[in-house]
Amino acid sequence: MNKIKRALAVGAHPDDVEFFMSGTLMRLGQVGYELHILTIANGSCGSMDLGPEEIARVRRREAQAAAQSIGATYHEGLANDMEIFFERPLLAKVTAVIREVVPEILLVHSPQDYMEDHQ
């Protein structure tokens, strides 16, 4: 019996996985991994022109389309932008996704990243 190999990429915002991890995910998909993408924040602060709810919807659709284009399952944002705190409620949500996916490989931001949300 073959065990399904899974990879989970976790990004702080919509577009982070696409910019920082999509090449690695695509390669993992080519060698048989089931791909998953989790975005912590929903992208609600991602525009100077659109309101928070509208830009969050736009960025969610874009992230879903990007995930679909590489054959990945997209797990939606768990918090609003600017609300990524290292606290139990958010950690519980992230843990729930990790337990659901049970990844062999977990891709995350570099700890030396330029942006606080990425740490």
What are these regions (language model features)?
Residues 1-102:
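Active-site rim/loop-helix segments in enzyme catalytic domains that contact anionic ligands
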Residues 94-119:
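Active-site adenylate/phosphate-handling loop in enzymes that bind or generate adenylated species
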